[in-house]
Design a protein with these regions (language model features):
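C-terminal accessory module of base-excision DNA glycosylases/AP lyases that mediates lesion recognition
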Residues: 152, 157-159, 170
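Conserved beta-hairpin
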Residues: 13-34
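Structured loops at beta-to-helix junctions and adjacent beta-edge loops in soluble globular domains
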Residues: 22, 33, 57, 165-167
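Hydrophobic helices that insert into or interface with lipid environments
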Residues: 136-137, 167-176
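Acyl-donor binding region in acyl/amide transferases
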Residues: 33-152
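Short amphipathic alpha-helix that is part of the acyltransferase structural core
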Residues: 1-12
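Short hydrophobic/aromatic beta-strand or adjacent loop that forms the aromatic wall/cage
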Residues: 14, 157-162
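Short, cationic low-complexity segments
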Residues: 175-184
Length: 184
């Protein structure tokens, strides 16, 4: 993750799968988590544990086909986490992404959503979760009063949301929510 993904960070993951090419060379990882948003399942009328987030596709380029690697990871996820009915992922417009890999693997596009890059705190852009972990809160008013009077939320480009159903029972709902794919 540190070397093969633009974020240069390893996210918290519940399940991860190594990717190898046909020569047996390790090519990277595909990681899934419960998601940063504790309400990730509610917009789909599901409960926590039925929805996971694809948090990282970090590959070194030696794999034969990224879409095939992702498809295999989704099949393994379905086996290893049978309670999971849906996978959510986001394409990051801040990186110029529109979700080409999700389009290539037939995910459903749900739209674009406001994105926060982080909070400028003491002159440094910091992720809200890191601030919350350190101070027990990340509310701007509290941070301005106790840490940095100049603290401010930094907005980013929108994130593009895609979902991949693992359970046929949720297909009708997902299809009704889906929109045409965005283009460059």
């Amino acid at each position: 993750c540190l070397h093969f993904h633009y974020a240069h960070a390893v996210p918290q993951a519940r399940l991860g799968y190594s990717v190898f090419n046909s020569d047996g060379e390790w090519c990277g990882v595909i990681l899934f988590s419960n998601g940063a948003n504790q309400f990730i399942a509610s917009s789909f009328s599901m409960v926590q544990g039925q929805v996971m987030e694809l948090v990282r596709v970090a590959l070194n380029g030696k794999q034969e086909c990224t879409s095939q690697a992702l498809a295999m990871a989704l099949k393994l996820l379905k086996i290893d986490a049978p309670a999971v009915r849906l996978v959510v992922s986001y394409a990051d417009r801040n990186q110029g992404h529109i979700g080409t890999i999700y389009q290539a693997t037939n995910w459903y596009y749900l739209g674009e959503f406001a994105s926060e890059r982080g909070i400028m705190l003491n002159g440094k852009l910091t992720h809200r979760r890191s601030i919350n972990s350190k101070y027990g809160t990340s509310t701007i008013d509290w941070l301005r009063e106790h840490v940095d009077p100049k603290a401010e939320v930094i907005k980013g480009e929108t994130k593009i949301k895609y979902v991949f159903p693992l359970d046929k029972r949720c297909m009708k709902t997902i299809k009704s929510m889906s929109k045409p794919y965005p283009k460059r």
